[in-house]
């Protein structure tokens, strides 16, 4: 079923967000996309999908099966889904605590997909359930069954940390890996700084574009985004990328359409109202800064 075209021109979008009743319209739009019983139920939704795969049951939507991530060995990577960008198939892999139970499988997924950028969109330093696969000490190597991961350099910025890594397989083949961790995602999931997230996003976007321009080992793999807190932070990143790419190419955008496309690939995603509203704040901030729009009175 085709997605309804709800795209807006840049000026129309900016004027819409600045209207006094824009928030109520955004909430109404969100409610039309996300069923009420699904709101905030990300963890249970993903568990349901994984259980269905384990039992070889048919999923409610067949396309979800095609978006799951398999290794070359045909093993499934639980809670990992391919997500398309704007006119870019499988630009992302979205995961939830993917290396929590099997770090080797997670690293194999990165290797098989030629991943060179890993992103964590929420702070996890204090999370007990996060299994960090690299060392926090520079020039330190951690050895797993099938891989070694070396921490080369840790670069700390005001709202994110960039860790430069080298992933080496059993044959001694090595690949560089850049890990970006966003450290400014608010604990309340609401008090965001759009400029901080945009700066984080564009640092990643710039590196990805540079890697594609100067690729040395085949096609650059998907950007892998690992969400730790079971919120929609990883989907916020994808929706932002889809919308900004579309507006640069066409001069139009639709957050609703972008969210629907992501939800076609990842069951139960973007099911927190705060995160949906944040997408509007992000894109409004970007457009206002980029086009230097004077506030309409």
Curated annotation (Swiss-Prot):
The active site is at 227 (phosphocysteine intermediate). Keywords: Hydrolase, Protein phosphatase. PROSITE patterns: TYR_PHOSPHATASE_2, TYR_PHOSPHATASE_PTP. GO terms for molecular function: protein tyrosine phosphatase activity. It catalyses: O-phospho-L-tyrosyl-[protein] + H2O = L-tyrosyl-[protein] + phosphate. It is an enzyme of class 3 (hydrolase). Its EC number is 3.1.3.48. Belongs to the protein-tyrosine phosphatase family. PANTHER family: LD27988P, RECEPTOR-TYPE TYROSINE-PROTEIN PHOSPHATASE. This is Probable tyrosine phosphatase protein J2. It comes from Microplitis demolitor bracovirus (isolate Webb). The gene is J3.
């Amino acid at each position: 079923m085709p997605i309804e075209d709800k795209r807006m021109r840049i000026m129309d979008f900016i004027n819409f967000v600045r209207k006094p009743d824009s928030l109520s319209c955004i909430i109404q739009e969100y409610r039309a996309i996300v069923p009420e019983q699904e709101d905030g139920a990300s963890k249970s939704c993903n568990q349901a999908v994984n259980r269905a795969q384990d039992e070889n049951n048919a999923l409610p939507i067949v396309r979800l099966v095609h978006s799951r991530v398999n290794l070359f060995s045909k093993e499934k990577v639980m809670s990992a889904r391919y997500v398309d960008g704007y006119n870019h198939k499988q630009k992302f892999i979205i995961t939830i605590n993917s290396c929590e139970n099997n770090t080797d499988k997670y690293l194999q997924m990165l290797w098989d997909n030629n991943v060179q950028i890993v992103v964590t969109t929420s702070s996890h330093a204090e999370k007990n359930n996060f299994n960090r696969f690299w060392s926090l000490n520079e020039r330190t190597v951690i050895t797993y069954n099938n891989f070694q991961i070396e921490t080369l350099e840790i670069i700390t910025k005001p709202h994110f940390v960039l860790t430069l890594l080298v992933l080496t397989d059993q044959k001694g083949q090595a690949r560089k890996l850049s890990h970006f961790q966003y450290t400014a995602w608010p604990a309340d999931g609401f008090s965001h700084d759009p400029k901080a997230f945009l700066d984080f996003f564009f640092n990643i976007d710039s590196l990805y574009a540079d890697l594609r321009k100067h690729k040395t080992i085949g096609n650059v793999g998907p950007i892998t985004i690992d969400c730790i807190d079971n919120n929609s932070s990883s989907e916020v990143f994808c929706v932002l990328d889809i919308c900004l790419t579309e507006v640069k190419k066409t001069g139009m955008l639709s957050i609703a359409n972008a969210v629907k496309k992501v939800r076609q690939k990842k069951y139960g995603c973007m099911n927190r109202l705060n995160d949906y509203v944040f997408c509007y704040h992000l894109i409004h901030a970007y457009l206002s800064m980029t086009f230097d729009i004077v506030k309409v009175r």
